[in-house]
């Protein structure tokens, strides 16, 4: 059995630890900020289905979130790496995952997600 998790752990580690002159705490803080901004570019952490009842924004943790939980300079990559595989404190919805798939299918172009009431004018199923 093989897993892609180690690949995504490594990608996250390289993003978080990209400043060799900084200590592990400052690296985590700066890298977490960069990661948070990139994830939000894909719509995570926002309510994508404003016109769909019951949709939620989910949660994309940031440095402030971890500082509130662990305290400043008390968390590192080892504390946060589970979010690199969509676990831990990262909260998503089915709408977020559908939106991510749509962005990839549209070659990086974002289109506001919509739910269809009927297909081909045949009315509700």
Where are these regions (language model features)?
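Beta-lactam-recognizing serine transpeptidase/beta-lactamase-like catalytic domain environment
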Residues: 1-125
